[in-house]
């Protein structure tokens, strides 16, 4: 498979390898006619950097020729190589302030296991997660705390909703789409009717939306659904996702994602009609239990919690206390 494909005049999709599923991330190179912009970076692995170098060579440029980096969000596959790329190119780096803060926290978290943080231990216990039954080594992804995550933590420019980044003769409009991550943005090229959507509008899979120990009391799934409605207001002819193939009907896909989460929420609430349950108890029934890798069990619990909190926000469920645990029940 070619590492780079021109998907629209002057806009290139680059395929970079990942050591986990999904196994490929699509990043996007934009020829701004006098400047080159990279939207998302891949992770900071030798394999990914080499693939990026080979892709750029196909259009006769090098990493050192990049003028700007624009990140949809801080996750390793989207922003992990930003530090190395900026070091080599001096590219002006753009990211939402919330994402830059989270990138810094991820580096700090990489120096310790999740169960070493008192606030995390209390959060796990409150939501029924039997932390003592799992090996601490499995409680975080293998890349955390390694050089594969080398993000810029002090970007050159913070971006926010409605900002327009002018690079060369292109205008990149920032649309804030919180949900998958609090500072997630999609990038809209209005003249071209092209939307680079990061993980917000994936064509085949649903992006993870969860509540984590550092985000207790938030409603990310509510934000995600609102963001799906928000992007439908824009005139788009070509959708460029971070995983999966390019496609055209962003409104149809946005509605599919909303319907999926509404169905999943109803499935979870049905399990609580006879008696209230913790997020972990519900997740074990919906996604499978402790035979799965611990990191997957954690993610499933946090995703379940996001659905339950949305139901509480919207008046379809209530939370209560069962000893020292928080439990949920459908109304």
Predicted regions located by residue number:
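Active-site HxH/HxHxD metal-binding segment of metal-dependent hydrolases
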Residues: 43-49, 57-164, 193, 248
């Amino acid at each position: 498979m070619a590492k780079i494909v021109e998907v629209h005049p002057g806009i290139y999709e680059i395929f970079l390898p990942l050591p986990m599923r999904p196994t490929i991330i699509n990043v996007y190179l934009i020829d701004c006619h006098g400047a080159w912009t990279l939207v998302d970076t891949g992770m900071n692995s030798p394999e990914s950097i080499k693939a990026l170098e080979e892709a750029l060579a196909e259009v006769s440029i090098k990493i050192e020729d990049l003028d700007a980096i624009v990140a949809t969000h801080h996750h390793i596959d989207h922003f992990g190589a930003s530090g190395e790329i900026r070091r080599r190119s001096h590219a002006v780096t753009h990211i939402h302030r919330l994402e830059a803060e989270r990138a810094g926290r991820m580096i700090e978290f990489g120096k310790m296991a999740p169960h070493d943080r008192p606030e995390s231990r209390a959060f796990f216990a409150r939501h029924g997660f039997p932390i003592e039954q799992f090996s601490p080594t499995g409680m975080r992804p293998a890349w955390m705390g390694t050089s594969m995550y080398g993000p810029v933590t002090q970007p050159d420019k913070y971006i926010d909703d409605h900002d327009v980044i002018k690079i060369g003769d292109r205008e990149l409009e920032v649309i804030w789409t919180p949900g998958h991550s609090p500072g997630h943005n999609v990038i809209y090229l209005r003249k071209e009717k092209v939307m680079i959507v990061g993980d917000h509008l994936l064509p085949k899979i649903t992006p993870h939306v969860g509540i984590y120990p550092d985000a207790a009391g938030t409603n990310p799934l509510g934000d995600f659904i609102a963001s799906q409605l928000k992007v439908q207001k824009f005139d788009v002819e070509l959708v460029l996702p971070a995983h999966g193939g390019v496609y055209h009907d962003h409104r149809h896909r946005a509605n599919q994602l909303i319907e999926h989460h509404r169905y999943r929420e109803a499935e979870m609430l049905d399990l609580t009609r006879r008696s209230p349950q913790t997020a972990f108890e519900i997740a074990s029934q919906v996604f499978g239990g402790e035979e799965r890798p611990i990191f997957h069990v954690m993610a499933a619990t946090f995703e379940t919690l996001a659905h339950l909190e949305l139901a509480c926000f919207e008046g379809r469920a209530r939370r209560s206390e069962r000893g020292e645990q928080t439990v949920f029940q459908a109304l």
